[in-house]
């Protein structure tokens, strides 16, 4: 049996900061730029999911730049300490909220007769109350090409996070050991995690599977044998 308590991020030991940049494209899709790095843990999927949920659009309409360039990418301190969903995700959500508000503010200039409080964004449409007013694609095209009311809609944030989340859990493993042969057989494993709200349950489950595999490797002193030739 093994128990764990795991903290997300490194605050207050060190700095936790992340940037995000969003722009509304001409076809109504959005472009997301980050300094955070996708290294196989599913970060890009979660960030795209957060933008899509905030803007009430399809994930297919969120184009994320997965190759970072420190000359132009928003600043981010890196991929470590299981921080990206929590720290960079905070920046992504805030950035998407700003872009959403800018979209609705621009929609108001196209629909002067509608009360701003009645405007909402979902299903790739601007709604006035319960009626579709203008599609997001049409609004985006107008924002780029209007001769009298052009305003390319973008948002950018830099978010410092001064709090952490704590995950806890335990793992039970039943093993069979042949002492004479040194052979180990894993009969049964049970993992129990209290992870809080899961942004993407399938990705979280896969990380548990990965951690379980690593734990088995540590337990039997697994090593990678290299051929120097």
Locate the predicted segments by residue.
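Cofactor-binding beta-sheet edge motifs in enzyme active sites
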Residues: 1-229
